[in-house]
């Protein structure tokens, strides 16, 4: 009986520690919130008069870098259409660009993800953008970049950030 009680207390402590590690990002100058799944994520740029969009890193910029942009689009534009437009007009000009696949994505806001690879300073980088539809004229683009191997390892964390992204 004593072992069961000790095991239960240890299990409860571990579950509480896991929940406590997750924080919610919110700022008065942005219209959204999302969960930050690990303390390794930190804001390097907060919104102010000069910068409208926050930026985050996972330890180091090469390990994981996140920018969030609000895209105002024509009525009826889908996240998939915006993803293809970004690829055609912006991403394909990156050095060593290799397009990835587009996948549907469900969270508090639904949309699509687009993955791609490119080269920066001789290193293979991975980009993964979540296009999340807020309404028929607003799509939020959560752009993650980092070294291919390192960003791939934290895919579950990028998914958590995108899944918990919601409007205030």
What are these regions (language model features)?
Residues 17-21:
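Sec/Tat signal peptide C-region and signal peptidase I cleavage site
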Residues 22-51:
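N-terminal "mature-domain start" segment
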Residues 30, 39, 71-73, 119, ...:
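Solvent-exposed coil/turn segments that connect beta secondary-structure elements
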């Amino acid at each position: 009986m004593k072992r069961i009680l000790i095991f239960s207390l240890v299990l409860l402590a571990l579950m509480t520690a896991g929940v406590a590690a997750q924080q919610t990002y919110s700022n008065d100058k942005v219209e959204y919130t999302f969960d930050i799944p690990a303390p390794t994520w930190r804001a390097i740029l907060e919104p102010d008069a000069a910068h409208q969009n926050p930026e985050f890193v996972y330890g180091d910029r090469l390990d994981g870098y996140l920018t969030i942009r609000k895209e105002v689009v024509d009525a009826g534009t889908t996240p998939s259409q915006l993803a293809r437009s970004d690829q055609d007009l912006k991403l394909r000009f990156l050095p060593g660009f290799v397009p990835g696949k587009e996948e549907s994505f469900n969270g508090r806001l639904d949309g699509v993800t687009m993955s791609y690879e490119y080269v920066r300073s001789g290193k293979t980088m991975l980009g993964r953008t979540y296009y999340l539809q807020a309404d028929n004229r607003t799509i939020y683009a959560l752009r993650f970049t980092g070294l291919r191997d390192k960003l791939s390892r934290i895919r579950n964390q990028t998914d958590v950030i995108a899944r918990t992204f919601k409007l205030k």
